[in-house]
């Protein structure tokens, strides 16, 4: 087996496109559709593979920024501190695996949820506004990441994912 993931994906896409597709019953529309979706998904994965680490880091940075804003503007701290420290450490560790970055981001989102449940109810509107504003970057990055899937109604309005993960914080 070839160890290069890009080459492996190319080989699988070629095999599915040239060999498997000819064996799929042309009258089986569902099978034909699923094969084409699978090939397209693999192609999308192949194009995104080199950017995966930057993408995960950008989402983790977005979560960290959101948590810091919540802590600062709600005046309540404590519930976010450890998860924020974990994400900060993940973002400074050059050897950390993508999965660990994503896990630390997920734990921070859980801590954000817990924080929101515990804040004073009078801060609800402030917290809502912080979350909405703080989520825009991640939403835009995720839309750009998946734009090639073909489900985005306004794909031409979505910036290229490479542009959205090229900031110094996400290198």
Give names to the regions the model predicted.
Residues 80-143:
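Amphipathic protein-protein interaction modules
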Residues 54, 64-89:
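Structured domain cores in non-transmembrane regions
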Residues 19-22, 26, 48, 70-76, ...:
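Surface-exposed polar/charged interaction patches
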Residues 123-171:
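Glycine-rich, aromatic-bearing surface loops/beta-hairpins
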Residues 10-71:
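N-terminal interaction modules that seed assembly of large macromolecular complexes
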Residues 1, 37, 55-62, 76-79, ...:
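Non-membrane alpha-helical secondary structure
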Residues 1-13:
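Acidic, low-complexity proline/glycine-rich segments
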């Amino acid at each position: 087996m070839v160890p290069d993931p890009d080459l492996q994906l190319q080989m699988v896409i070629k095999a599915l496109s040239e060999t498997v597709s000819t064996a799929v019953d042309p009258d089986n529309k569902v099978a034909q559709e699923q094969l084409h979706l699978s090939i397209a998904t693999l192609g999308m994965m192949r194009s995104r593979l080199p950017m995966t680490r930057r993408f995960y880091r950008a989402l983790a940075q977005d979560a960290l920024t959101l948590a810091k804003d919540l802590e600062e503007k709600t005046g309540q701290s404590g519930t976010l501190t450890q998860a924020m420290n974990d994400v900060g450490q993940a973002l400074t560790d050059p050897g950390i695996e993508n999965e660990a970055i994503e896990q630390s981001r997920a734990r921070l989102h859980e801590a954000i949820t817990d924080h929101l449940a515990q804040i004073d109810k009078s801060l609800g509107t402030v917290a809502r506004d912080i979350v909405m504003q703080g989520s825009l970057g991640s939403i835009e990055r995720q839309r750009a990441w998946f734009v090639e899937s073909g489900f985005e109604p306004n794909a031409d309005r979505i910036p290229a994912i490479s542009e959205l993960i090229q900031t110094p914080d996400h290198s």
